[in-house]
Amino acid sequence: MKKTSLFVAEIALSHEGSIGNACALMDLAKNNNIDIVKFQDHWARYESSKDELFRVPIGFDKTRYEYWERTEFDQTEWSYIYDYAKKININIGFSIFSPQSFFRQKKLGNHIWKLGSGELLNNELIDILIKELNKKDTVIISTGLCEYSYALNIAEKFSSSVKEVFILDCISEYPCNYADYSFKTWLDQSSKLKKISYGLSDHSGEIWPTIFSWSYGCKMNEFHITFDKKMFGPDQKSSLDPSDLKNLNSAREAFNIISRNEKKKISSLKKNMINFFGRSIGLKNSLPKGHILRREDLLMRKPNGGFSFKDLENIIGKKLKIDLNYKEILKSEHFEK
């Protein structure tokens, strides 16, 4: 279990266009020790058209253009969100979907960028990022709609020019089913990478894929968050709610404690337990004064504190100087000198 694995809470558009909700979701992430909160900057005017439809209709906005437009923030609102992230001391990042949304967030000082799997087909945006990003920037890439080799090729274009690159295994279904994961095969490939870190972007709405990924040493684990899975919006069922986040945080804290010590240490309590459950040489039956001890007279009795098993050969042949009850453990004063 790797303590260095980053947890990314994808707020996306679960805020439904409300700055209050956006800040409250950041609080939810912060209170559960999330490392990075991530938003999506869908700027309808520069990204979409009236012909862009939902894969699964949500019953309120007829087109994605309407949805993006209804939930988007302007520059002033994004600036407020940035300031709030600084106030609560949590890192913030963005999925960007157009050159305009990139330059808007760059102007505000963002340095954590995600290219969703759909944007790996957006050559215009990729070319701009390659030119504009530097060693202050982190790039996150999802495989989702693309073959691993294609996503890796894009990731390698950034590896020499930015601070760090992550490539995340992703299934672009909301929610996705456990049976659809091919994570172990993907992990075997990604573990060979040198300049690119690997991880999981999960849409299951459960904590188990993240725990599985983390246990295999993945460097980044991303998941959507929400106040309630019954809330309106296309991502809510695929998100972790406050109860999920609490359980995930508890697991993370427990695993960190468990994995912290490389060498087992025996505490004073454990030493007392060893004494309690240890054994000493005793008698099978009560024996009279003057009896010379034989092997068949002896056995090991609890607790520890008398002669140990390694002393057995030295005890054989000793002569008792008193009558001795079998309930006693043998001590030096029981023998004639």
Regions found by a protein language model. Give the residues of each.
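Catalytic cores and adjacent flexible loops of soluble metabolic enzymes
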Residues: M1-K337
